[in-house]
């Protein structure tokens, strides 16, 4: 099964992300991390409202506040499902494409701790964004 990303937009706003662009962004993030996306299967990106991501953040991270992006690994046979990235465009400080890459990097095993700007993850994210934007 070739790597692909499904996009589910549950927002009332004008957030736009095509499955093709989401696939390109995630593929580039995984390749940057030395992973072979073609062996990974499927990933989903859900665009949600602030109250939805707030509930998820409370349930899974015990944080009683909305956030911009959450990533969830999905256990399953290798090559079927990688996980889900949940993004709240209304809570975002980064742009939508950066949040997709950010979520994919979390799924690849990266973390940034409390200081994102000083992290290796921030440097990798910047390289990926420069590559996909042709800079």
Curated annotation (Swiss-Prot):
GO terms for biological process: rRNA processing. Its main location: cytoplasm. InterPro entries: MetalPrtase_cat_dom_sf_prd, YbeY, YbeY_CS. Its cofactor is Zn(2+). One of its GO terms (cellular component) is cytoplasm. GO terms for molecular function: metalloendopeptidase activity; RNA endonuclease activity; zinc ion binding. Its EC number is 3.1.-.-. The keyword Nuclease applies. It comes from the Bacteria. Keywords: Cytoplasm, Endonuclease, Hydrolase, Metal-binding, Nuclease, Ribosome biogenesis, rRNA processing, Zinc. Zn(2+) binds at residues 102, 106, 112. Binds 1 zinc ion. PANTHER family: ENDORIBONUCLEASE YBEY, CHLOROPLASTIC. Single strand-specific metallo-endoribonuclease involved in late-stage 70S ribosome quality control and in maturation of the 3' terminus of the 16S rRNA. Belongs to the endoribonuclease YbeY family. This is Endoribonuclease YbeY. It comes from Rubrobacter xylanophilus (strain DSM 9941 / JCM 11954 / NBRC 16129 / PRD-1).
């Amino acid at each position: 099964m070739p790597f692909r990303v499904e996009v589910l937009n549950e927002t009332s706003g004008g957030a736009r992300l095509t499955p093709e662009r989401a696939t390109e962004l995630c593929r580039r993030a995984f390749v940057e991390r030395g992973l072979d996306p073609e062996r990974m299967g499927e990933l989903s990106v859900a665009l949600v409202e602030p109250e939805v991501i707030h509930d998820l953040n409370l349930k899974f991270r015990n944080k009683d506040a909305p956030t911009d992006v959450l990533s969830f690994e999905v256990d399953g046979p290798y090559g079927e499902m990688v996980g889900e990235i949940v993004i709240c465009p209304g809570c975002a400080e980064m742009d939508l494409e950066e949040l997709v890459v950010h979520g994919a990097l979390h799924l690849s095993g990266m973390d940034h701790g409390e200081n994102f700007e000083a992290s290796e993850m921030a440097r990798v994210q910047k390289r990926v964004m420069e590559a996909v934007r042709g800079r």
